[in-house]
Amino acid sequence: MESIVWLLLLSPALVAGSLHPRIDNGLAKTPQMGWNSYNYYSCSPNEAIVRSNAKALVDLGLADLGYRYVTTDCGWSVADRLPNGTLTWNETLFPSGFPAMGKYLHELGLLFGVYGDSGTKLCGSPPDQVGSLYHEEQDAKTFAEWGADSLKYDNCYSDAATNYPNVNYEPSTSPRPRYEIMSSALARVGRPILFQICEWGIDFPALWAPALGSSWRIGNDIIPEWRSIFRTLNQAVPNTDFAGPGQWADLDMLYVGNGVFSLPEEQTHFSLWAILKSPLTIGAALKDDDTSINQASLEVLKQKDVIGFNQDALGVSASLKRRWSDEGYEVWSGPLSGNRTVVAVINWRDESRDLTLDLPDVGLQYAQVARNIWGKTVVRDVRTSYTAGVAGHGTMLLELQGTIPSGLYPAKIFAKSTDQKTTFESIYAATTSANYELAITFSRPSTETVTITTSSGQTISISGKSGRIALTAGSNTITIQHKTPIESIQITPPTGTYYANTVFNVTGSAKHTTCGSGCSPVGSKIGDLSPNSNAYTSIPATTVGSKYLAIDYINNEVAFSSSWGWGSNSRNLTVSVNDGAPVRLEVPLSGRHSELFSPGKGWWDTATLGVLTSGWKKGENKVVFGNQGGEDGFQTYAADFVGVRILD
């Protein structure tokens, strides 16, 4: 059976194959792990700092867990090259030199990471430090001669058309050609050097970076504020299915251990970076003359299960499955090797509470084992849902084993039988509908007529093995009167009816626009939904109750320049039924093309998220999409609205 998760939560763009040609140098078969100086020491590293932190990787047992790349970020170089044109280090800060640094790291069993820039100067200038622009071939050879194992390659002072400013988030040309040049130069040095592309997500590098390097930054820098976690995850949503062996979406370095986040926040940060298959780069001061990492944060970084999710051989990123904006939580999930599944339920509220995972939201109906990683508990025989306490800003991180796909209910797990009556419990319904398809598998061939009673109050008789039944959104029971023993039942949700934006009327500033080849599946959308406007239509329903809506939206509010402050890359979108209370979604980014140079600038790329709406009546229903709450601090304009599938 096609999973309801596939039906409701994946846009056509995400279903299509998206692993682009990738560099094939044998590196980064799993996401790289290590330590970088920037998040704690900014652009002020020195030899003693790097060496002491590198030794701490070994002494604290982190190197044995895979943290091996040690990178000195900005602040290591000087303003001028040597007379022969080669790069050199700041001899005051690094008196032994970079070749000696590489030798020291290699003797510790670690890997030597260097940092460069595709512009005229390194980030962090002034004081000026020379970049690699127009010197790529020479610098690649120099890095190799020093014994470098990786290169983080930044994007400052790089836009010639605007006289090489420190930062330009809207350059006149793509950063791609500069990264192609360095990638080619590295390929010729005769030494494997892992290339980390760090151009901040400009020009949607997921489309081209995998052919050049082993990882690409998806967005602007993480900042030492909790809100940056939500912003980064929103940016990650359209990148997740590009990840794979040798090509990883980089969510930026970790702030775990820097005294910025609470312990639950650090667990959330580390969990999501891990399951999205981001490189795991420690940004904390592990050990120097003045400080050392606290034990609780160290235990987060050393959590072997979470590291195992990141380094899993299957190499598939988790993706966003559901988001409840008003309720303040969301669900991410992805497959692991060994037929396992990892699930993260994030509690965005700053209060502890119980949260429930409905397994069908991640494509499952049953788990033989549920391991709660941070809760340190193991539960067996999980049927349809799992509930646990989650700390404020914390995450319920689960490893599910021995799973059954959603919609399949084996009698030995879900049913109780007496004589010729079998009652199935924990039957999940995403929507209230009389159009669910029930298929019965008997233990032996049978053509008998059976009587079915559902908890919605329906009683029907069906001949053969299948029929249509009514279920209510939530948990249901089904009782079957029969003679032949039942092995299992399978329930398929209704496919529903799709309503394109073109059948909606608009008010205020809202307007219909066409999209060239984009805005799948209809080629148009409604944009400019401000708080004083909406899109409305009348939609028929065959039953009373709550209905699941799969909403097609577009958002490419990348918010590069505003991300340093309170800038948000989510967009508000609300839906109300029959003038009832609106259900609100803060939708993440959907753009999967360049925000600068593609025909639609990423605003033609459709994604899908689902919500459950109440207040439906039999017959015609007034359905309104808008931007309620936009006047209260959410985005001035809602996400663009493409269409909606109503499951009735």
Curated annotation (Swiss-Prot):
InterPro entries: Aldolase_TIM, Glyco_hydro_27, Glyco_hydro_b, Glycoside_hydrolase_SF, Melibiase_C. One of its GO terms (molecular function) is alpha-galactosidase activity. Substrate binds at E199, W200, G201, I202, D203. Its EC number is 3.2.1.22. The active site is at D154, D221. Glycans are attached at N84, N90, N339, N505, N572. Transmembrane segments: none annotated. SUPFAM superfamilies: (Trans)glycosidases, Glycosyl hydrolase domain. Pfam families: Melibiase_2, Melibiase_C. It catalyses: Hydrolysis of terminal, non-reducing alpha-D-galactose residues in alpha-D-galactosides, including galactose oligosaccharides, galactomannans and galactolipids. It is found in: Secreted. Residues 1-17 form the signal peptide. Belongs to the glycosyl hydrolase 27 family. This is Probable alpha-galactosidase D. It comes from Neosartorya fischeri (strain ATCC 1020 / DSM 3700 / CBS 544.65 / FGSC A1164 / JCM 1740 / NRRL 181 / WB 181). The gene is aglD.
